[in-house]
Regions:
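N-terminal Rossmann-like NAD(P) cofactor-binding subdomain of oxidoreductases
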Residues: 1-193, 200, 296, 342-343
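Short glycine-rich or small-residue beta-strand-to-loop segments that form or flank ligand, phosphate
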Residues: 2-5, 142, 241-243, 305-308
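Conserved active-site and cofactor/substrate-binding residues in soluble primary-metabolism enzymes
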Residues: 11, 125, 146-153, 202-210, ...
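Short, well-ordered loop/turn and helix-capping segments at boundaries between secondary-structure elements
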Residues: 22, 217, 326-330
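C-terminal substrate-binding/catalytic lobe of Rossmann-fold NAD(P)-dependent oxidoreductases
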Residues: 27-66, 167-168, 177-305
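Active-site catalytic microenvironments for nucleophilic, acid-base chemistry
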Residues: 157-161, 245, 323-330
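C-terminal helical cap and adjacent loop that interface with cofactors, partners, or active-site loops
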Residues: 282-343
Length: 343
């Protein structure tokens, strides 16, 4: 299968290219860019492959003629400007940015601080590709954000089964520096990140509305969440620590929670549920896995859920390949056999 990647110079785009290069069903990868210096884009791959990497200027018609699917690994706002032609022609696209995630254009403008170029009708029909829960049925797939993925994976069993107070959810999430993208900023400067920990975008992170959008699909009476994001002094990895008040009045709360997680994820190849333990980043970094653990406090009736992912894998490129596999009917694990780095 011939695939196109639009926007390959960022961290997520680079990892996506690496994954697709090893995918058993991918025969050709064509790279497209809106940047003027095509040679500079191609040079970043010289050390990764002996084959010549050809980078071409973005041309929607040429992409559709030469490929069977297009991945957009572009910054927010770019897909919205470029994707309408693909959508009009029902050409499959998988978007790693946030441009197709929110069904309400006004919500996009509020949280991303720019107007969307995508129509409300298109947004309402886009598939939100949280692969463990969403059957991919449309030709345009919105790959979930990294914070959203970890948070929703941790909350899903408890929200769907109404085991928690839906107005009590607090999320304290922390990500490695690659989650902030490749563009240099004061917050991601080495001197400011190394041996430091900082919070950013408190109650303002753009993944909040997509989290709420999905939670309300599972539970329409879901209340707002308190959401905090922090920057870890590591390259990759994301941990969401989630707190919620348990509504079940039973001595068997731990068994009830365990049964909910087991029933939800028992046949999901990329989810590891830990019994009586808490996950750390080493369990997932370098892989497409989500590792989840929890602890219930019978004194406060609060359950603490810890959900960890690699922000560039399950939080971006890995889940994009999962969506690709699901859409085309490939084995869900195809191209995603990477083990955690651990060391």
């Amino acid at each position: 299968m011939k695939v196109a990647i639009v926007g390959v110079t960022g961290y997520s785009g680079t990892v996506l290219w690496q994954l697709l290069s090893q995918h058993p069903n991918v025969t050709e990868i064509n790279i497209y860019t809106t940047q003027a210096d095509l040679e500079a884009v191609a040079q970043q791959f010289d050390w990764q492959t002996k084959q010549t990497v050809r980078v071409m200027p973005f041309d929607a018609g040429q992409i559709m003629a030469d490929n069977e699917v297009a991945f957009f690994a572009t910054p927010a706002g770019v897909t919205g400007e470029l994707a309408e032609t693909f959508i009009e022609n029902h050409f499959p696209i998988i978007d790693l940015s946030g441009d197709l995630r929110l069904q309400d254009p006004k919500a996009y403008q509020k949280w991303y601080h720019r107007a969307t170029e995508v129509s409300r009708e298109t947004l309402s029909h886009a598939t939100y590709g949280l692969t463990e829960f969403t059957a991919t049925t449309t030709d345009y797939i919105a790959n979930p954000g990294c914070y959203a993925t970890a948070t929703l994976m941790g909350l899903a069993p408890l929200v769907q089964e109404r085991l928690i107070d839906l107005d009590s959810v607090i999320v304290d999430a922390k990500s490695g520096v690659t989650g902030s993208g490749k563009k240099l900023s004061q917050a991601t400067h080495y001197v400011d990140v190394d041996e430091n920990f900082s919070l950013y975008k408190l109650n303002q992170h753009q993944h909040i509305p997509e989290i709420m959008q999905q939670l309300k699909q599972w539970a329409p009476d879901m209340g707002p969440i308190q959401f905090t994001t922090g920057l870890l002094p590591v390259k990759r990895g994301l941990m969401a620590t989630i707190y919620a008040k348990v509504t079940a009045d039973s001595a068997d709360v731990n068994e009830i929670i365990a049964a909910a997680f087991q029933a939800t994820y028992m046949d999901k190849p990329f989810v590891k549920i830990l019994a009586n333990d808490m996950p750390d980043l080493r369990l997932v970094v370098g892989s497409n896995m989500t590792a989840i653990g929890w602890s219930y406090n019978p004194v406060t009736h609060i359950v603490t859920i810890v959900s960890v992912i690699d922000n560039l894998m399950k939080g971006a490129a890995g889940q994009a390949v999962q969506n690709f596999n699901q859409y085309f009917g490939f084995d869900e694990t195809a191209g995603l056999a990477q083990l955690p780095l651990m060391i």
